[in-house]
Swiss-Prot record:
Record GO terms (molecular function): adenyl-nucleotide exchange factor activity; protein homodimerization activity; protein-folding chaperone binding; unfolded protein binding
Gene: grpE
HAMAP family xref list: GrpE (MF_01151)
Source species: Xylella fastidiosa (strain Temecula1 / ATCC 700964)
One term under GO cellular component: cytosol
Signal peptide residue numbers: none
Location within or outside the cell: Cytoplasm
Summary of subunit composition and partner proteins: Homodimer.
Record protein name field: Protein GrpE
Function: Participates actively in the response to hyperosmotic and heat shock by preventing the aggregation of stress-denatured proteins, in association with DnaK and GrpE. It is the nucleotide exchange factor for DnaK and may function as a thermosensor. Unfolded proteins bind initially to DnaJ; upon interaction with the DnaJ-bound protein, DnaK hydrolyzes its bound ATP, resulting in the formation of a stable complex. GrpE releases ADP from DnaK; ATP binding to DnaK triggers the release of the substrate protein, thus completing the reaction cycle.
Stretches the record annotates as Disordered: 1-23
Main location class: cytoplasm
Pfam family, one: GrpE
């Protein structure tokens, strides 16, 4: 310490203190900027990962339901083939056999592409998959169960494509 000039010592201390040393101030500023940039990079990476996951999910959904329009348009064909089989009776004939084979092949292709048939006779009425067109009093079936199907319903990969039109048993 300089006893002749005590003010010099305090001046030296002030110049070298971390609050006033320009290099230390700049280093702290740069450290703050680096931390901010690192946080930005992490946010951008997370956003990019979220976009990638959304894109994968969207592509998967598009693949899963790409045939929805086509299969939906084939439902009346299934209905017609089914009605034709019912009308032809149970007597074997080449025409009936051909119709049945065509129906089974077409249905297999549709099922392989995610279609599921809803033929709920005897099942409990499910408003998510069935549309009740009437109720009938019956003694041998529990109330709330489907007793007749007017039109079969269909699901595509667990999504309702068309509800089954049904008659439901009601209480006496």
């Amino acid at each position: 310490m300089n006893q002749d000039h005590p003010e010099c010592d305090s001046e030296e201390l002030t110049q070298n203190s971390p609050e006033t040393d320009p290099l230390k101030v700049e280093v702290e500023t740069l450290r703050g900027e680096i931390a901010s940039i690192k946080a930005d990079v992490l946010r951008e990476r997370a956003e990019l990962e979220n976009q990638r996951k959304r894109l994968i999910r969207d592509v998967e959904q598009a693949r899963k339901f790409a045939n929805e329009k086509l299969l939906g348009e084939l439902l009346p064909v299934f209905d017609s083939l089914d009605a034709g089989l019912t009308a032809s009776g149970s007597e074997p004939s080449p025409l009936r056999d051909g119709l049945e084979l065509t129906y089974k092949q077409l249905l297999k292709v549709a099922i392989d592409n995610g279609l599921m048939l809803l033929d709920p006779v005897g099942q409990l009425f499910n408003p998510e998959h069935h549309q009740a067109i009437s109720q009938t009093e019956v003694t041998d079936v529990e109330p709330g169960h489907v007793i007749q199907v007017f039109q079969k319903g269909y699901l595509l990969n667990e999504r309702l494509l068309r509800p089954a039109l049904v008659v439901v048993a009601k209480q006496d």
